[in-house]
Amino acid sequence: MTDLEKIIKAIKSDSQNQNYTENGIDPLFAAPKTARINIVGQAPGLKTQEARLYWKDKSGVRLRQWLGVDEETFYHSGKFAVLPLDFYYPGKGKSGDLPPRKGFAEKWHPLILKEMPNVQLTLLVGQYAQKYYLGSSAHKNLTETVKTYKDYLPDYLPLVHPSPRNQIWLKKNPWFEKDLIVDLQKIVADILKD
């Protein structure tokens, strides 16, 4: 049994995740040892959890466009890790999905990150990921954090969620696709080459 398999077993047997495990729901993340780019988001949505495949929706199509990669590279190259702040769908709230459960990322991310020694860039998708990884260096709102993305390179790059629901935000912030996405595609191409 590999170290990652031991971690997965520990996640599934953890009392915090017992209800999911009893209902046959496995933790949803990807952590290939060869990963060079780590994508940290909030948590799987209900459709994602049911489909058992992360970023396999309209948001994922847009994310791969932003990265400048195809599905084959994204899912099967071993160069992308997907490590949400919670590996399970946290449930529905009044205005959307509930936030990731407290303490989940703190408990499991450090163990899993040790298993991926080649990660060169971590993409922080959305405010929860940015607050968790950037801490006090994150700005008061997502727009300011994303706008100052160069301050966090080369280790981190904050992104707005690629959801079609963010179309208005993208229209209000043309610099995102004009500058940040151009830089992101260059960085990703450099990391993936060879």
Which residues make up each language-model segment?
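Conserved beta-strand scaffold positions in the cores of enzyme catalytic domains, especially
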Residues: I39, F80-V82, Y156-P158
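Residue-level marker of positions within ordered structural domains that often coincide
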Residues: G45, G68, H161-P164
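Short, electropositive, low-hydrophobicity segments enriched in small/polar residues
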Residues: G45, Q49, R64, Q130
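Short, surface-exposed acidic-centric catalytic microdomains
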Residues: L53-P100
